[in-house]
Amino acid sequence: MELVAEFEKLQSHVPPFPGNEAKKIIEKETGKAIEELFQSFDETPFASASIAQVHFATLKDGSKVALKVRRPDIEEKIELDIDILKYMAKKMDEHHIMDQLDPQGIVRTFESAIHKEMNLVHEGYNLQRFAQNFAGSETVFIPKYYPEYTTKKLLTMEFVDGVHPYDREGLTRIGADGPVVAQQALAAMLRQICEFGFFHADPHPGNLFRSEEHTAELTSDSDIVCPLLLEKK
């Protein structure tokens, strides 16, 4: 259980980078000052994961949004990690270690997936597709995506407050039944795989919320929102 508790921190409690750096990234990506973009911007992130952190802001029209801002040095770190993995996989192949698993092939697949995950525009398109797939659903809610405020390093989506499925006290507070929430999440996952052929491939509790406002299972990403999506038909 101690290991589980430590790994849970990676979902949304990774040490954040300074909020003023996030502001600079947003301004550079959009070409506008923070004051031109938002009525308000909270420099303190409310979630922080391995690739990006999330800030609360209010658009000029009063819409509340969540801003996913990519870490400033993450690209270099990931490329270094990939180089290390490639070296290890090559050595494993040379010594015929786990040949049946194709170590170099696994690394190539990971490299392709992580590069997609790094492009937040790609994540925004995935959000749109999920929203289309679950349109009219009474158990799944997908936050609105704002493409005009999204770039490779910045994703803007509707802010919706919610409770993670592992937060039993939180679920009780909003009147949600844990087993029902689990059933809704499972049903949504099966629809993605069996009906849509397009599914969320990283549905850990940090990427799922139960929303009191919408009385539905809210799929999102504190990391943020649909961190890895695979198409399988």
Map each language-model feature to its residues.
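Broad phosphate/nucleotide-binding scaffolds in NTP-utilizing and phosphate-metabolizing enzymes
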Residues: M1-G197, R210-E212, A216
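Conserved catalytic-loop position in the HRD/HxD motif
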Residues: D202-H204
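Positively charged, low-complexity/disordered segments
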Residues: E217-K233
